[in-house]
């Protein structure tokens, strides 16, 4: 019984600024409700605060902000992020299609061999001149490798530039290391 009196005194001192305050304080009192419960003959009091997180409203309006409370309208944020992801996916597919039809030619020294790759680094064709064929298989192998490396570097550079342009068009800051 002594603990109940101590708890009551504690809450009275906690609520003392509301007892004879100004109008703003009196309106704040509407959000504090004392609950009386009888439990096995004892009169226990508990304090419920309805003012936090938008609880305790009498009108049941279905506005997003009152439902979300202090966190804001999470549903609208989720939908905005979802739309942004869809835009990124659509633009990325568009860039991939552009790269798939683009062709990049690579040459060896003396342009005896020409290798053509797509923007997705897929080989399309290899052109070998008669002069390169006369050099022998070992030298021809080196020339084809050199031309392939040249075409590959041009294709990768073009892909990075297009992806960087895509990132900048979507509002990402320029110069991200992962895109260059």
Curated annotation (Swiss-Prot):
Q: Name one Pfam family in it.
A: YbaB_DNA_bd
Name the major location. Answer: plastid
Q: Which SUPFAM superfamilies match?
A: YbaB-like
The UniProt entry, under InterPro entries, shows: YbaB-like_sf, YbaB/EbfC
Keywords tagged on the record? Chloroplast, DNA-binding, Plastid, Transit peptide
Gene Ontology MF: a single term: DNA binding
Transit peptide: give start and end. Answer: 1-48
Lineage top rank: taxon: Eukaryota
Q: Where is this region: Disordered?
A: 45-65
Q: Which GO terms describe its cellular component?
A: chloroplast; chloroplast envelope; chloroplast stroma; plasma membrane
Localization annotation: Plastid, Chloroplast
Q: Where is the composition biased (Basic and acidic residues)?
A: 56-65
Q: What does this protein do?
A: Binds to DNA and alters its conformation. May be involved in regulation of gene expression, nucleoid organization and DNA protection.
Listed under subunit, the entry gives:
Homodimer. Binds to the translation initiation factors TIF3E1.
> What's this protein's family per the entry?
Belongs to the YbaB/EbfC family.
Q: What is this protein called?
A: Nucleoid-associated protein At4g30620, chloroplastic
Q: Which organism is it from?
A: Arabidopsis thaliana (Mouse-ear cress)
């Amino acid at each position: 019984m002594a603990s109940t009196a101590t708890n009551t005194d504690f809450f009275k001192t906690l609520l003392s600024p509301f007892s004879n305050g100004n109008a703003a304080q009196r309106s704040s009192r509407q959000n504090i409700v004392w609950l009386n419960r009888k439990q096995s003959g004892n009169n226990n009091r508990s304090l419920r605060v309805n003012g936090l997180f938008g609880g305790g409203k009498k009108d049941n309006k279905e506005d997003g902000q009152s439902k979300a409370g202090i966190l804001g309208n999470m549903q609208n944020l989720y939908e905005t992020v979802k739309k942004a992801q869809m835009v990124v996916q659509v633009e990325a597919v568009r860039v991939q299609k552009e790269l798939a039809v683009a062709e990049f030619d690579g040459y060896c020294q003396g342009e005896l061999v020409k290798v053509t790759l797509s923007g997705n680094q897929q080989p399309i064709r290899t052109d070998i001149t008669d002069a390169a064929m006369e050099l022998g298989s070992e030298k021809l192998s080196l020339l084809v490798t050199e031309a392939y490396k040249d075409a590959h570097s041009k294709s990768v550079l073009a892909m990075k530039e297009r992806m960087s342009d895509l990132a900048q068009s979507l509002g990402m800051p320029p110069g991200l290391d992962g895109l260059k």
